[in-house]
Amino acid sequence: MVGLSRLAGGGLLLLLLLALLPLALDGKPAPLPQALPEALAGGTTALRRDVTEEQQQQLVAEESSGPAAGRSDPKIGDGCFGLPLDHIGSVSGLGCNRPVQNRPKQIPGGS
């Protein structure tokens, strides 16, 4: 048997709460849960709007356009990795594996 000192801590309060809980409900049973709405026959695809022919053409045009659309050469212009170089990169040649055409000649001993 559990001692009274142990029940006096938190156990007595729990027993009192459990004993008074039916009185708080006024003897009424808990309400039954409502039924969930039934799903549509087509699932989530039935919720989609119909796409018009014009919208479909726009989607196809957006998918076919982009940064690489219509290119046959991987590089464009004088840039590296298909991107144009800034002034510093074009002078120093950093990031490119080819010689720079308009590189200024360095003067030995100059600052």
UniProtKB/Swiss-Prot annotation:
SMART domains: NAT_PEP (SM00183). Residues 1-27 form the signal peptide. Its main location: secreted. It is found in: Secreted. GO terms for molecular function: hormone activity; toxin activity. Residues 51-77, 92-111 are annotated as: Disordered. InterPro entries: Natr_peptide, Natr_peptide_CS. Pfam families: ANP. Residues 28-71, 107-111 form a propeptide. GO terms for cellular component: extracellular region. Negative results: does not activate natriuretic peptide receptor 1 (NPR1). Belongs to the natriuretic peptide family. Snake venom natriuretic peptide that exhibits vasoactive and probable hypotensive activity. Is only weakly active on natriuretic peptide receptor-C (NPR3). This is Natriuretic peptide TNP-b. The lineage of its organism: Eukaryota, Metazoa, Chordata, Craniata, Vertebrata.
